[in-house]
Amino acid sequence: MTETEDPWGKLGQWFPEITDTSWTALRQYTSLLREWNGKINLVSRKDMDRLETKHLAHCLTITHFLRLMPKAQILDVGTGGGLPGIPLAICYPQARFTLMDSIGKKVMVLEDMVEKLGLKVQFLKS
């Protein structure tokens, strides 16, 4: 993909099963992630120009196969910048997600993000 191509258009082609509501929240999440990543290293800064096509696409690949029952419980260990936990929590609102990381600052930032996104996600600091 060239720099002039729209990563969101490409993602929409790759993941047609994702709802418009989820796409809106995913865009908001990547915006928040970029904002916070300038202050605290959540994701490798060298990858930020390819955030959607590298990290987000990898997280969403499982949506082609995974069907979750209501109230299914998912644990994201070593979540870092909330990947894959937050994108999956956006796509699977019927499930219960817990994100765990050993770095307290990252957990605090992620708590702020999920509050702004209106997600019901729990956190553990290991």
Regions found by a protein language model. Name each.
Residues 60-126:
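Conserved SAM/SAH cofactor-binding pocket of Class I
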Residues 2-70, 105, 112-119:
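Class I SAM-dependent transferase core
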